[in-house]
């Protein structure tokens, strides 16, 4: 692509390619980021590399010339806009369905899911190389994965469609019958995002309902060559697992939630560790029937990518009552401290905290303190007495509010600000006892309250 480079934007139902005109591109390395792709002009994974950096080393598009980008082609990801709206609920080509995918580019070919199909395109022109129409449950809106083959089996495009894991021949777009049963594997529990490819292993998560009981949210792995199931990691600690004692009164039984739902996974290719960001146990906002810290909910768990064997865990919230699980897998990087290189990861949570851990051991690098937090007045609830606060870095988002933070005369007029404060008080006022303020109890006979702020 001498003399030009494309920026690809996927927005809703349209894929747009932008072109910048300039001189030859200068390609640079990715420094100390682990597992950089061999072809820097490709975008082979959801976040570019297995470390989840989202960083491209290409230098042709810059802050100086980005304003000169011109649209050169578009591709409609939702071809059948006249389809009935009922089909938009995850099946077929519904008029209300869309694609929220990050396209991947491997060996100069772009792959992505549309609505009800998976396509391969020429990045320079948007021309279709092949399309595969998906019947039944629609393909994941988040993206697809590429497995390079093994000399016997050809390269494959692998994606989730409901509870099915499907493999296509990357060159032809046809079902690869050597994978599973005629190109499909029944995952049993659905997964709506992008499988992780590590060597000949495919790792998938789980999307489970929000009810307290139901299907497990376990991460699972399948053989990329045959589709055979390799391992399953219990996201709710079972008898004999580390952390099983964090579920009181057998509350681990038939417990849903704590699922591995992220759009993608990150893996330390050198150490063979995949990092599972696990969600809150169900139910999200009441834990009276699950007293204890509830491992491995709200945790990052490192497991052996080949075997699924537990290596370590770090829990960001004990006994979550706020649905403040990690919104994404950790990013992997190396840092130098006291003259020593440390393999690190950074995990964010919906509480606004970032935890920087040694990705080999799970130990905090800059310290974590267990601090007392507010109690709960909800009958039957037993909020955990402490929560882990990172010493560094400081919160990356506001995690508590005071009444004066909601509106002030500087935001509007004094009269309007006073009217807003009166309206807030009329509806119960503001309850805030700092980070991890619990939900207040209101009997059915009591007036409505509260405007809760945390």
Stretches found by the model and what they are:
Residues 8-19:
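Bacterial N-terminal signal peptides
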Residues 25-60, 91, 384-400, 404-420:
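N-terminal pre-domain segments of enzymes
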Residues 31-82, 102-106, 362:
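Mature N-terminal segment immediately following signal peptide/propeptide cleavage
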Residues 40, 82-100, 106, 111, ...:
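PEST-like low-complexity, intrinsically disordered acidic/proline/serine-rich tracts
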Residues 53-65, 83-96, 247-250:
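Short, polar loop/linker segments at the starts of domains and inter-domain junctions
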Residues 64-78, 118-138, 148-151, 164-189, ...:
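Extracytoplasmic/lumenal domain signature
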